[in-house]
A protein has these predicted regions:
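Conserved nucleotide- and phosphate/pyrophosphate-binding catalytic cores
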Residues: 1-158
Length: 158
């Protein structure tokens, strides 16, 4: 696997439960999958861990709140992020509104990818062509490898 390089900085996508990164081996409700329906994405984002909000102005965010803001940086506009940053720093943040906005922006980000995957999976003829090309390429590579193996072993019968 190759790490996704976003603006020359490696991106760690934080989980929705505030306990590290999103991972298929972790809490299923804290991870957004490209195959998740729009409603499932909204449901998962709305269950993201939050608290009652900051008690004092300009206090540092707890890790689980910082995770939500990191997710927003991946899919939300700069104006949206700035509005919620200001709300947080002024102790007027409404996490329900923040999560609704994040959920909609996440749906808008993931839906086109999911739709493209579904279109590819539903194109049986296209998939057959891809598999045929892959098989031809693998067969060619395997034949070359076997030729080298036979030469190395002195089994050049063909």
């Amino acid at each position: 696997p190759i790490a996704f390089n976003y603006n020359q900085t490696l991106v760690k996508v934080p989980s929705l439960d505030g306990l590290g990164k999103m991972s298929k081996s972790e809490n299923q409700m804290a991870t957004l999958y490209l195959a998740d329906s729009d409603n499932m994405i909204r449901k998962k984002v709305m269950k993201a861990k939050t608290d009652s909000g900051p008690a004092d102005k300009n206090t540092p965010k707890p890790d689980y709140i910082e995770n939500i803001f990191l997710l927003m940086n991946l899919v939300c506009t700069a104006d949206t992020i700035q509005k919620f940053e200001e709300d947080y720093n002024n102790c007027t943040i409404r996490y329900g509104d923040l999560k609704k906005q994040l959920a909609e922006d996440m749906v808008n980000f993931i839906a086109p990818i999911r739709n493209k995957v579904e279109a590819i999976l539903n194109d049986e003829e296209g998939l057959k062509q891809i598999m045929q090309k892959g098989a031809e390429k693998a067969n060619k590579s395997a034949n070359e490898t076997m030729k080298l193996v036979r030469e190395a072993m002195g089994l050049n019968y063909f």
